[in-house]
């Protein structure tokens, strides 16, 4: 091994291109991916049903994750002495995977992965699982009592997030959009990202949609949402929704009206590539330009904010789940009160003293949820 750490992020970025462009990459990746399938024994060992088995296709997001893990595994399989030789052939590594002949054991893979970059225990375990399935090895578990540096770092960030006043953050961004972005001209390339970010932010805040869902809406869609309070669409794709006809809801009126005002002056600005990180870059820039300081800004904090506010104001959990387009209310539970959302928007300071009792009473009353939702729509 070299006296210095040659296995690092910069070195990996160079190798990543080389690995992906290797002639055997796709065929060996397909083989490795197919080995992740877990066919039940009652099918695999049944003389009748085994001949009718079919490979269930992996979701695009799953394949994307698998490809990322596969590239890192190939990179970590290359010995240190070869890492500075970009003319090195990867045949040895691809042969190893194809023939399931071991070059490094799971623990050595862990060591090299940690040398490459700081990762969470969960990410590392998922990569190891992919590796052991791919190489037909016994299961390897990272010891329970282990906490990696990245886990400690994220734990500290989460502690800070609990004290983050989300309402103040959202109000700061809305004020910035109203004061600075609303009248910007999209003819200037530098301003386009801010305009896109502002429109998508307002749509997310008004509907509870995810960032890649919100950018699919047109000006006409916003008009329908504002006028009718609902939108039925067979063209807008929602995460984990198999239905061809999805329903979107107007949860907060004012952000949608602000989105429409900006969007109607720039009707083609959200026409960007389908598979791009641009919306996330726009979101981060919007926060930076607004003066909001967050260690780990995430677009789904808006969904957390809306879910918590709706639930705390008395909307039943099942109704909140429906508004968030969750298939199960169990998913919505993870959203509730993760952040300090700030003063309850439906209560005065005096009423906040009885907040918990009132909210529970409202959840037990079928009429209250409708009133709560109407309040949000008028905002």
From Swiss-Prot:
<dbReference type="InterPro" id="IPR050090">
    <property type="entry name" value="Tyrosine_recombinase_XerCD"/>
</dbReference>
<keyword id="KW-0804">Transcription</keyword>
<feature type="active site">
    <location>
        <position position="239"/>
    </location>
</feature>
<dbReference type="GO" id="GO:0006310">
    <property type="term" value="P:DNA recombination"/>
</dbReference>
<keyword id="KW-0233">DNA recombination</keyword>
<dbReference type="GO" id="GO:0003677">
    <property type="term" value="F:DNA binding"/>
</dbReference>
<feature type="active site" description="O-(3'-phospho-DNA)-tyrosine intermediate">
    <location>
        <position position="335"/>
    </location>
</feature>
<keyword id="KW-0805">Transcription regulation</keyword>
<feature type="domain" description="Tyr recombinase">
    <location>
        <begin position="169"/>
        <end position="348"/>
    </location>
</feature>
<feature type="region of interest" description="Disordered">
    <location>
        <begin position="346"/>
        <end position="379"/>
    </location>
</feature>
<dbReference type="InterPro" id="IPR002104">
    <property type="entry name" value="Integrase_catalytic"/>
</dbReference>
<feature type="active site">
    <location>
        <position position="326"/>
    </location>
</feature>
<dbReference type="InterPro" id="IPR011010">
    <property type="entry name" value="DNA_brk_join_enz"/>
</dbReference>
<protein>
    <recommendedName>
        <fullName>Very late expression factor 1</fullName>
    </recommendedName>
</protein>
<keyword id="KW-0238">DNA-binding</keyword>
<dbReference type="Pfam" id="PF00589">
    <property type="entry name" value="Phage_integrase"/>
</dbReference>
<feature type="active site">
    <location>
        <position position="210"/>
    </location>
</feature>
<dbReference type="InterPro" id="IPR013762">
    <property type="entry name" value="Integrase-like_cat_sf"/>
</dbReference>
<comment type="function">
    <text>Plays a role in nucleocapsid assembly and serves an essential function during the final stages of the DNA packaging process. Participates in the processing of branched DNA molecules at the late stages of viral genome replication.</text>
</comment>
<feature type="compositionally biased region" description="Low complexity">
    <location>
        <begin position="362"/>
        <end position="379"/>
    </location>
</feature>
<feature type="active site">
    <location>
        <position position="303"/>
    </location>
</feature>
<dbReference type="GO" id="GO:0015074">
    <property type="term" value="P:DNA integration"/>
</dbReference>
<comment type="similarity">
    <text>Belongs to the 'phage' integrase family.</text>
</comment>
<feature type="compositionally biased region" description="Acidic residues">
    <location>
        <begin position="346"/>
        <end position="358"/>
    </location>
</feature>
């Amino acid at each position: 091994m070299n006296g210095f750490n040659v296995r690092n992020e910069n070195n990996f970025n160079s190798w990543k291109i080389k690995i992906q462009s290797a002639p055997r990459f796709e065929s060996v990746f397909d083989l490795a991916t197919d080995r992740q399938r877990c066919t039940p024994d009652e099918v695999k060992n049944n003389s009748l049903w085994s001949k009718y088995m079919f490979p269930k296709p992996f979701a695009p997001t799953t394949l994307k994750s698998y490809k990322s893990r596969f590239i890192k595994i190939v990179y970590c399989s290359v010995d240190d002495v070869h890492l500075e030789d970009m003319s090195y052939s990867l045949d040895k590594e691809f042969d190893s995977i194809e023939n399931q002949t071991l070059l490094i054991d799971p623990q050595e893979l862990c060591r090299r992965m940690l040398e490459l970059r700081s990762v969470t225990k969960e990410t590392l375990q998922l990569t190891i699982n992919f590796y052991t399935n791919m190489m037909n090895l016994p299961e390897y578990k990272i010891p329970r009592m282990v906490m990696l540096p990245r886990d400690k770092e994220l734990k500290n960030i989460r502690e800070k997030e609990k004290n983050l006043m989300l309402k103040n953050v959202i109000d700061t961004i809305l004020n910035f959009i109203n004061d600075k972005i609303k009248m910007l001209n999209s003819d200037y390339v530098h301003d386009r990202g801010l305009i896109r970010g502002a429109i998508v932010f307002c749509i997310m805040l008004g509907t509870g949609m995810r960032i890649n869902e919100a950018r699919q809406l047109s000006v006409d869609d916003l008009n329908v949402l504002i006028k009718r309070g609902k939108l039925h669409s067979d063209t807008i794709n929602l995460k984990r929704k198999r239905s061809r006809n999805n329903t979107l809801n107007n949860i907060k009126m004012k952000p949608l009206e602000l989105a429409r005002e900006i969007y109607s002056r720039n009707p083609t600005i959200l026409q960007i590539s389908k598979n791009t990180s641009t919306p996330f870059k726009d979101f981060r820039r919007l926060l930076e330009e607004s003066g909001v300081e967050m260690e780990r800004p995430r677009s789904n904090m808006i969904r957390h904010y809306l879910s918590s506010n709706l639930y705390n104001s008395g909307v039943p959990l099942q109704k909140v789940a429906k508004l968030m387009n969750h298939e199960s209310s169990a998913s919505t539970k993870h959203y509730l009160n993760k952040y300090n959302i700030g003063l309850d928007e439906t209560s005065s300071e005096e009423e906040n003293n009885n907040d918990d009792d009132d909210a529970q009473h409202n959840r037990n009353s079928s009429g209250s949820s409708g009133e709560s939702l109407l309040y949000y729509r008028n905002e």
